[in-house]
UniProtKB/Swiss-Prot annotation:
It comes from Ralstonia nicotianae (strain ATCC BAA-1114 / GMI1000) (Ralstonia solanacearum). NCBIfam families: gltX_bact. The gene is gltX. Residues 120-139 are annotated as: Disordered. GO terms for biological process: glutamyl-tRNA aminoacylation. This is Glutamate--tRNA ligase. Its EC number is 6.1.1.17.
Length: 465
């Protein structure tokens, strides 16, 4: 019977989650969905000083916004301390781990001496019990760390789904501290116990964890577990070619939401940021899940391209249902000082203004002309466009618009043509002053469409003003 696929996302809640971080959730989520398996969320919060509930909330909010639903969790490492201590005690009892009383000062001196000799700095096994070895006397009043007895000789080998075969000699690995003097377990140990207890079959994570992997595999095997399949993702770089980070100006995932990006655009963009399905650039979440595999994960760092994300967002804005778009854009309009109630139907406005916008913020900026609580015309624009020459044309247009049997864009456009023909004018001569009077600005979508949405009553009142 084939083992059920179980993947996990295991972030540390230290306050910030950017696109590179959330990609490490998207890929295991997609793989679990593709394989009809389980996706688990684990919060690695053992760094008590830096971990906050607010940061956890940001992670959950980002995942919810992107639609990365979980099957189990969130599990919190700080709530599993009893389990970790149980396993540590078991390992000491089975001679898989041992207490080490070497002080920090002694360890620093040891490493400095090794550096002077040109050796790799490492713990030398002073307190490691071996047959026939006499250990030093434990110093009074000193709480030891607990170290894992790393295998001596041989090597750790795994076939990484991204990087291929990796082999690390055990001679390169010293005996890892798995519990601090106060008894709290260390990161690499907790990860192993969690992955084993949660029956994780595939670990898809950033390649900054590659160096941890041989240590984790050795501990896992010592506990009788089977290592999962590892897939270490290359780094995501920012526009300058540096590792993406808050320090280098990366935006948080929820920052993209607040800037007016659609979740489907961000998911589509992230999917291609380190994975490919032929030349496909645009695909739905469902298509992504169907296509996703580990074989086509990229082996080189992926570089963030804001223009590409904006292009994708424009595509999804254009494709979006107008009623849904209206609901999303309304807060942006209100933040700009607009009042949607009493204005044209927002969904109808979306149909007119959405095509050229790269973000919901840009949609709102264009749509705002319909929802200003008051309009005013700058004196210099009035002097330029609302001239004595053009006023008779405006009055003639108002007369024709007032008698239209139907307030439709086509009829409004025909009224413009009649007045333009009678006066021998080009469209801008009449359209510009009408825009100023009705919308308070010179730049708008097509004037006949704008007037149709404003409605006859508003248009005639403003033309008369």
């Amino acid at each position: 019977m084939t083992q059920r696929v179980r993947t996990r996302f295991a972030p540390s809640p230290t306050g910030f989650i950017h696109l590179g971080n959330i990609r490490s959730a998207l890929y295991p989520w997609a793989f679990a969905r593709k394989m009809k398996g389980d996706f688990i969320l684990r919060i690695e919060d053992t760094d008590v000083e830096r971990s906050t509930q607010e940061a956890v909330d940001v992670i959950l909010e980002a995942m919810d916004w992107l639609g990365l639903d979980i099957d189990e969790g969130p599990f919190y490492q700080m709530q599993r301390m009893d389990r970790y201590r149980e396993v540590i005690a078991q390992m000491v009892a089975q001679d898989l781990a041992y207490p080490c009383y070497m002080s920090t000062e002694e360890l620093d001196a040891l490493r400095e001496a090794q550096r002077v000799r040109g050796e790799k700095p490492r713990y030398d096994g002073t307190w490691r019990p071996e047959p026939g070895k006499v250990l030093p006397t434990p110093p009074a009043g000193v709480q030891p760390v607990i170290r894992f007895k790393n295998p001596i000789g041989g090597s750790v080998v795994w076939d990484d789904a991204v990087k291929g075969r990796i082999e690390i000699s055990n001679d390169e690995l010293d005996d890892l501290v798995i519990a601090r003097p106060d008894g709290t377990p260390t990161y690499n140990f907790c990860v192993v116990v969690d992955d084993m207890d949660m029956r994780i079959t595939h670990v898809i994570r950033g390649d900054d964890h590659v160096n941890n992997t041989p240590r984790q595999i050795n501990i896992l095997r010592a506990l009788g577990g089977t290592p999962p399949i590892y897939a270490h993702l290359p780094t995501v770089l920012n526009e300058q070619g540096e590792k993406m980070s808050k320090r280098h100006g990366a935006m948080s995932v929820t920052g993209y939401r607040d800037a007016g990006y659609l979740p489907e655009a961000v998911v589509n963009y992230l999917a291609r940021l380190g994975w490919a399905h032929g030349d496909a650039e645009i695909f739905s979440r469902e298509q992504f899940v169907e296509w996703f595999d580990l074989e086509h994960l990229g082996k080189s760092p992926a570089q963030y391209n804001p223009e590409k994300l904006a292009w994708l967002n424009n595509h999804y804005i254009k494709q979006a249902d107008n009623a849904r778009l209206a609901e999303l854009v309304k807060p942006f309009i209100e933040a700009l000082g607009g009042r949607v109630e009493g204005g044209p139907q927002l969904a109808d406005v979306m149909a007119l203004v959405k095509d050229r916008a790269n973000t919901l913020q840009e949609v709102a900026q264009t749509a705002l002309l319909f929802y200003r609580t008051e309009i005013s015309v700058a004196p210099e624009l009035a002097a330029q466009h609302l001239t004595d020459e053009v006023r008779p044309g405006i009055m003639a247009l108002a007369d024709k618009l007032g008698t239209l049997p139907e307030w439709k864009r086509e009829a409004i456009g025909a009224a413009f043509k009649e007045v333009l023909g009678a006066h021998g004018w080009k469209m801008p001569k009449l359209a510009m002053p009408v825009r100023l009077l009705v919308a308070g600005q010179l730049q708008t979508p097509s004037i006949d469409a704008v007037l149709e949405l404003f409605g006859r009553e508003v248009v005639l009142r403003r033309l008369a003003g």
